[in-house]
Design a protein with these regions (language model features):
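Mature, extracytoplasmic segments of signal peptide-bearing proteins
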Residues: 2-5, 16-138
Length: 138
């Protein structure tokens, strides 16, 4: 056992350089946001405005050589509305280095007609008390 210690110590202290690849949290968020917007924009009316809030924190680092590629895919066929889980894979040199689940909160904002005062059941509406405002239609 005593003879094993110098060998392990020498290996740990050897000048081997590990290439470390890092991906920032903002890069992951941006990739998920672009994927979601590409999926959602074709289904929406022209006056709708999608807003995507990606819930991912922390940078990722792993030992690998090459440029990282971020893959994003859906986990279900449900429409992307509200909190939706995405699968994210990070590949370097054709090898998957990391897989994770990321939540994207998708909100659809659209202009709608709203009343400026409370309307009772059966009350007739007039355009005087209404205005056009943008609201969350998710």
């Amino acid at each position: 056992m005593k003879s094993l210690f110098p060998v392990v110590f020498a290996l740990c202290m050897s000048p081997v350089v590990w290439a470390e690849t890092a991906i920032s949290a903002r890069e992951v968020q941006k990739a998920v946001e672009q994927f979601v917007l590409a999926q959602v924009e074709s289904e929406l009316p022209e006056d709708a405005r999608p807003v995507v809030d990606v819930r991912w924190q922390g940078d990722l680092a792993f030992a690998a050589d090459g440029a990282p590629k971020i893959r994003v895919r859906r986990t279900s066929s449900r429409p992307l509305r509200g909190p939706s889980v995405m699968r994210v894979g990070i590949d370097v040199g054709g090898q998957t280095q990391r897989k994770m689940s990321v939540t994207a909160d998708v909100r659809i904002w659209r202009p709608v007609v709203v009343a400026s005062h409370m309307i009772k059941r059966g009350e007739e509406m007039a355009l005087v008390g209404c205005e056009l405002a943008e609201r969350d239609m998710t």
